[in-house]
Amino acid sequence: MICMSRKPSPTRRTRIHRFHKGSCGRKLVGLTCYDFSTARVLSDCELDFLLVGDSASGVIYGYENTGSVCLDEIIYLAAGVVRGAPNSFIIVDLPFGTYEKSDELAVETAIEVIKRTGASAVKLEGGARMACRISAIVRAGVPVMGHIGFTPQTINALGGYKIQGRDNADLIYLDAQAVEQAGAFAVVMEMVTEDLAKTITSEIKITTIGVGAGRYTDGQLLVINDLIGLSEKKITFAPRYASIDNTVASCVKLWRKDVLEGNFPQKDHIPA
């Protein structure tokens, strides 16, 4: 299959300046997004960025862990998001196994993502151990967002789903410095203690984005499914602002009832 390349629009590309620390004078706000229709809605919500996250592994594809999603699966989703929100700053996660092996592999993957989706930047997990990969991708001309603290792709190595920074604060602090020095334009801190996140935010020069990392990061990011109530699990740091799952179920049941009772379709539902 021949795959046409897409070039990011100048509008999306220039918005990376919004991530310069303190340039907005307010918190940056972002959500994950996985499809065209949702992207179209979110494009009018004054968000600073959208992330096509590898969290799609569970919430979209139904895999048991984040590491199961493959590159093509992420790329297909990201291309739809870019089409739905053409003027948004869109970041795409590099899936597990697509960048760790070598600088060359990391660069190839990052460039493929940008060329095939038209996204603005990529995100990868890992601090000091991935600094070389970040530097290589940045040198190749692709903006990189880092990700430290709890890193879902390596959940087994972290000993499960738990808060980071209680007994490894020094290592996470060094990770933040390494990501900054490698040339990342921002860094996600996931499930990091609030005090550590506050310290890191005050001492590094790149923008920090918190995911369950307290009140003092430069910005906040959540999985949209958690925010709108379209996920089975309730996450402590992600309050539900709606219950879309219940709304959808109610609509479907009402429509089914109308069909069975002969109330659908009515005359105005029939094409002329």
UniProtKB/Swiss-Prot annotation:
GO cellular component terms, A-Z: cytoplasm
Record text on subunit structure and interactions: Homodecamer; pentamer of dimers.
Entry binding sites for 3-methyl-2-oxobutanoate: 54-55, 93, 123
Similarity comment: Belongs to the PanB family.
InterPro entries reported in the protein's UniProt record: Pantoate_hydroxy_MeTrfase, Pyrv/PenolPyrv_kinase-like_dom, Pyrv_kinase-like_dom_sf
UniProt protein name: 3-methyl-2-oxobutanoate hydroxymethyltransferase
EC number: 2.1.2.11
MF terms (GO), sorted A to Z: 3-methyl-2-oxobutanoate hydroxymethyltransferase activity; magnesium ion binding
Keyword rRNA-binding: no
Keywords carried by this UniProt record: Cytoplasm, Magnesium, Metal-binding, Pantothenate biosynthesis, Transferase
Active site annotation, chain numbering: 190
Locations listed in the record: Cytoplasm
Function of the protein: Catalyzes the reversible reaction in which hydroxymethyl group from 5,10-methylenetetrahydrofolate is transferred onto alpha-ketoisovalerate to form ketopantoate.
Cofactor: Mg(2+)
Extent of the signal sequence: none
Record's cofactor remark: Binds 1 Mg(2+) ion per subunit.
